[in-house]
Regions:
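Predominantly cytoplasmic-facing regulatory/coupling regions of multi-pass membrane proteins
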Residues: 1-73, 130-236, 262-325
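Hydrophobic transmembrane-helix microenvironments that flank and shape a buried ionizable site
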Residues: 3, 48, 86, 110-111, ...
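Membrane-interface alpha-helices at helix entry/exit sites of multi-pass transporters
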Residues: 66-70, 84, 88-89, 98-115, ...
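Transmembrane alpha-helix interface/packing and boundary motifs in multi-pass membrane proteins
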Residues: 76-83, 229-244, 248
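Transmembrane alpha-helical cores of Major Facilitator Superfamily
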Residues: 77, 112-115, 233, 274
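Re-entrant/interfacial helical elements at transmembrane boundaries that shape
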Residues: 88-98, 241-256
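Hydrophobic alpha-helical membrane segments of integral membrane proteins
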Residues: 91-95, 107-111, 122-123, 239-241
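Hydrophobic alpha-helical transmembrane segments of ABC transporter permease domains
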Residues: 111-131
Length: 325
């Protein structure tokens, strides 16, 4: 159903706007834009991997930063290439959990790491949308009130008395409280988690601005920033096809509401999608190396087992067969 939702959004956009704006936007992609997007993606990937490494260490399933960077590139490629936009993160959590001997903690570390990044992104988006004019500026007081209520509720769950029941909900709540305190709010790591998340959001916005300029958008940066923030928030909706769907729909609506043209918004979103996919291609190399390595290890184990079996047979003493008189 989620994939169908993303396909429906794209179908509506193409029916109403045609594919001319999309094709024209893709034709503007140049070598410098790809290189710039790849450079920004390297910085954001390192910061994201650092955030994951800090959260995982707090939960007791530490991952070295070098390995975290490679795994994060791989998950970004899978997120960009597969429907839903989260399968790469699920794979990253499962793989790390198996390597660490605790799949549950591995998955939770990835989940909390992504949640921390999205929380910082929401806070920055609220600040930008409150300060700068945008098509949703008039709705921001109500949005801010809802956000404050959500924050107060989360603080109450974290700082309140832990439940003592034995139900599944009580156990899950106790685990979540312990994870947040150890993985996200630990005094030694919380500042680094927030700072790395800020750099990641800034990198995504920079990539969006690169895509906008590449697609021919000439609006001032201060006008583009609120639009970029809203499009980035739309990308967190898992109803997409490899990242495509809600991003293009929201971009087309926002650019039209801002007087920049829906076709321009569709072109910018399409260019952004291509730049992000191209910048994640190192993850494809990591995936291929991992797959080849696992295949070689499997062949080595099979050959070793066969050799041990032959050696065992060779060690069995030969018993002469008696001949009947």
């Amino acid at each position: 159903m989620r994939v169908l939702g993303g396909a429906a959004i794209l179908a509506i956009l193409f029916c109403r706007l045609g594919i001319g704006a999309l094709v024209d936007g893709l034709r503007t992609i140049s070598g410098w834009s790809l290189v710039a997007a790849a450079a920004v993606a390297f910085v954001t990937t390192v910061c994201s991997a650092l955030r994951w490494s800090l959260v995982a260490r707090g939960l007791g399933v530490a991952v070295p930063l070098r390995g975290a960077i490679a795994a994060y590139y791989r998950s970004q490629f899978l997120n960009s290439a597969l429907p839903g936009g989260v399968l790469g993160d699920v794979h990253r959590g499962l793989q790390h959990g198996r390597d660490a001997g605790d799949v549950s903690r591995g998955l939770r570390a990835v989940g909390w790491e992504r949640l921390a990044g999205q929380a910082v992104q929401v806070v920055l988006a609220l600040i930008v949308l409150l300060v700068l004019p945008s098509p949703v500026h008039s709705s921001m007081p109500a949005v801010l009130a809802i956000a404050v209520l959500c924050v107060l509720g989360a603080v109450g769950l974290i700082r309140g008395r832990p439940p003592r029941g034995t139900s599944r909900w009580d156990r899950a709540l106790r685990t979540a409280r312990a994870d947040v305190r150890a993985g996200l709010l630990a005094p030694r790591t919380r500042a680094a988690i927030v700072l790395s998340s800020v750099v990641v959001v800034a990198g995504h916005m920079t990539t969006f601005l690169i895509a906008a300029r590449t697609a021919g958008a000439t609006a001032p940066v201060l006008q583009m920033l609120p639009l970029a923030m809203l499009v980035l928030l739309a990308m967190t909706v898992p109803t997409n096809i490899g990242g495509w769907g809600p991003r293009e729909g929201v971009a087309a609506w926002l650019f039209a509401a801002a007087g920049l043209g829906a076709g321009q918004g569709l072109a910018v979103a399409a260019v952004y999608g291509v730049l992000v996919l191209a910048a994640s291609l190192p993850g494809a190399a990591v995936l291929a190396i991992t797959w080849l390595g696992s295949g070689n290890r499997g062949s080595t184990r099979a050959a070793g087992s066969q050799s041990e079996g032959l050696a065992g047979k060779a060690d069995v003493p030969h018993q002469p067969v008696p001949v009947a008189a």
